[in-house]
Amino acid sequence: MQDSPVGVRFGDYVSAFTSGGTIAAAWDRGEWYRRGYQMGMEHRGKGVDVQLGPVVGPLGRNPKGGRNWEGFSPDPVLSGIAVAETVRGIQDAGVMACTKHYIFNEQEHFRQPGGFEDFGFVDGISSNVDDKTLHELYLWPFADAVRAGTASIMCSYNKGNNSYACQNSHLLNYILKGELGFQGFVMSDWSAQHAGVASTLAGLDMTMPGDTGFDTGLSFWGTNLTISILNGTVPQWRLDDMVTRIMAGYYYVGRDKTAVPVNFNSWSLDTYGYQHAYAGAGYGLINQHVDVRGAHGAAIRQAAARSTVLLKNVDGILPLTGREKFTAVFGDDATENPYGPNGCSDHGCDNGTLAMGWGSGTSFFPYLVTPLEAIKSEVVGKGGVIQSVVDNYAYTQIQALANQASVALVFANADSGEGYIEVDGNMGDRNNLTFWQGGDALIRNVSAICNNTILVIHSVGPIIIDEYKNHPNISAIIWAGLPGEQSGNSLADILYGRVNPGGKTPFTWGQTESDYGPDLIYQPTAGHDSPQDNFEEGVFIDYRAFDKKNITPTYEFGFGLSYTTFSYSGLRVDKITAGEYTPTTGMTKAAPTLGNFSTESADYQLPANFTYIDAYIYPYLNSTDLKTASMDPEYGVDVELPAGSQDGAPQSRIAAGGAPGGNPQLWDVLFSISATVTNTGELAGEEIPQLYISLGGPDDPKVALRNFERLSIQPGESATFHADLTRRDVSNWDTVSQNWVISSYPKTVYVGSSSRKLPLSAKLDFGGY
């Protein structure tokens, strides 16, 4: 298995794909599937069985969350559809997808125990979330991933309601495996397992290194798992269940037929070296340098361009022609990292153009086409003049060049990543929502002089840019996100009109940081073993929070301009006969046991002449006495185990369950929605009509996204938008009945071009449901 959600981590001759948080802006099922399939093919070509991605945790509760860029969107429906298509793509390529991080993993600060005793804590942060918010927000995209057949789910570092996610029986056994009917295996994040038997019985199926410390050879499992089975603490059926779940995923994606031997090494790009790097063992051929990229560069260029969002375009200044009298390019973000595109470990720096965040969710760039080189190629090829200043702090030179420019392209960025790397004082999470590397001063310097300034943003999420939206000299603003290896080419395709922008922002751009509601916890209060993060806002994050508090955003969720214009008309709602919702009833079968095994500890001793590799974890015993073999001073001490977790007898089925993703009737289509979208401009373009619903209750969002479709329309022509509303789409989670219910509140559907531009609406008739 291998990271990452944007490509094969540590591999050479691999692609650096557009990030999840950027390609979400394409709002295109086909684009998400293709990206998943291409990533899957590259992992498969390198010999990887499990791709550690995609990501829907973090969902994006706060825009400063360090790993938001690895996921898709703070909207659960947009994220849910994107993750489902990505899972299908990865697994159709013959690789198991590992959807992560389950669940409530919404910030990097304090995600793991240790290192913050000064605050009075010894454990990782606890995300405290109510049942309604769990189901209607954070669990929603995981349910979509399960329904799409994800072979694996990774549990997260944090606690959920004061129980670590990787030993939280309610979240793993009851919700994930019970209610959602997850058939695959749950694996821990690295160092996310904090107990042995408790994790086993709570639903953890596979552990990753670091549970007791990296490179120690010690584990809560290994020898201890063998002991817990021999002494009866862990029943046989649970071991069989763990193995079955792992192998089910293996066969489900056809690894028995499509597996490729591993042909690279995570710890070295050298051709020859140690297969077991830490132990210094197994010297030989470790890297065959297999090129798995195929034609993916062209696909990445297309995906990044189709994910680019045009936020401002005064008087149609864009697209440019390349024949402007004098093109000036400003900013470190326009050019290359002086140390090379892979010059910082896990991309843990902000040097040069930003095309990927930092951390374990990264991959090496095979190359990185910078904006400056792509723009220069465009302008020079058409006989134009182009000059640049890429030092953000060279104010004298910046002002001199801005005075000459007929068009000024200013590049600025904001980065984030995983918490084990600190960049410019940002420990994974962003400290604020401003530009990095003096970006704001750069923009102000140029725009104060050049009255035709175009701002290009590469960022992990929203930035406070209201000043620039309203600046008379800033003619256009483009958000290009984290586009991957084809950054410059995809941007040039937009700037010079080869691609008509059609992306829509997958998050809200606020006027101030406080607009977003609860902040991340940077300075926790004492009083508990863990910092306590109470998700008191419930389902009201991002645009839902802005709507609830009547805050006007700079740019609303779903917003994006085009070089053409569109109109909406002819909303139609057709009611579909689906019958009444029936809760799942009955009993499960007893947990099966598969064969027999020896209970004699002598049969599990380290085999004679066994070649032991230092710091590797093995299941063998070093003594026939289980207590001695465990090396656990608390062996035999009674501990509290998850209630019912040792009981393999038939269990009552969960009313909201019954199939992967939940009760299968949740996906009954109750309404079919259609509308006409007309291209009223002079250029062919793509529009993304969006379907929202008001569920009508006092505790419901004003509107919530439920569906969308990306349409390609020629000038003067129309296309029909089609979208279904399922039972789940029109339901609320009822905490009393523990099921989805359609409330009696009146419900309205809306169709339009963004969450705040919804010209079409209709009431829904629920008679018969």
Language-model-derived ranges and their functions:
Residues M1-G648, G658-N732, Y745-V751, S755:
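Glycoside hydrolase catalytic-domain context in secreted enzymes
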Residues Q738, S743-Y745:
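A glycine-anchored, Pro-Gly-centered beta-turn/N-cap motif
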Residues K757-Y769:
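Short beta-strand elements
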